[in-house]
Amino acid sequence: MDIKLKDFEGPLDLLLHLVSKYEVDIYDVPIVEVIEQYLAYLATLQAMKLEVAGEYMLMASQLMLIKSRKLLPTVVEDEPEADDPELELLSQLEEYAHFKAASQVLAKKHEVRAQYFSKPKVELVYEDVTLNQDKTIQDIFLAFSKIMAEKQEEIRRRHTTIARDDYKIEDMMLIIEEAFSAKNKLFLDELFSDAKDMNQVITLFLATLELIKIHRISVQQETIFGTITLRKEWTNE
């Protein structure tokens, strides 16, 4: 069973996605929070054994430098630094945001012209999942990144050393459906409360994505960075 996650166009695209959630000016975002979310996202990709392009890892090293500088005690200097990596990054993000917005406008104009001057475009259908309130699989994935980091720390504190690698997505789908037998909704983090190791956590998440994809469950997130709620979309027979 293959579940594809829609890739970002690059590290700046991922960062812009994270920054845009705060709905403030780019220069006013809590940069350390954004950096932590970016690093958690990459850590989740690696834990799920998904390929991470080198450009994302390069950006991660730059972000770790910025984060370390932000967390260090402030030192009063006579002259400001010529090169501020944080300001440079935010400037790049601002420029990328303008470029992306302009490219989207051009793409829409091209589609309008194509309707009048060319044959109907035949598209290769990519089955992406549209969630309530314009949420995407990436939003669920980013929420899961935080849950996984917390679960990983919990398992580490328990000193758990035995791990299985034979969990099946189909079996986890049945377990999730069983969890809905007595209720119509669950919080995303509830699914992982009894997970014994990270392999089970990851397989449960993939099973959740598959159930969303086939419309067995739907997803809601009332506020930005709020709790993810899963709702049952079938009736008990």
From Swiss-Prot:
Compartment list: Cytoplasm
GO BP field: cell division; chromosome segregation; DNA replication
Keywords: Cell cycle, Cell division, Chromosome partition, Cytoplasm
Gene Ontology cellular-component terms listed: cytoplasm
HAMAP family linked: ScpA
Function in brief: Participates in chromosomal partition during cell division. May act via the formation of a condensin-like complex containing Smc and ScpB that pull DNA away from mid-cell into both cell halves.
Family, similarity comment: Belongs to the ScpA family.
Subunit structure, interactors included: Component of a cohesin-like complex composed of ScpA, ScpB and the Smc homodimer, in which ScpA and ScpB bind to the head domain of Smc. The presence of the three proteins is required for the association of the complex with DNA.
Identification of the protein by name: Segregation and condensation protein A
Organism whose genome encodes this protein: Streptococcus thermophilus (strain ATCC BAA-250 / LMG 18311)
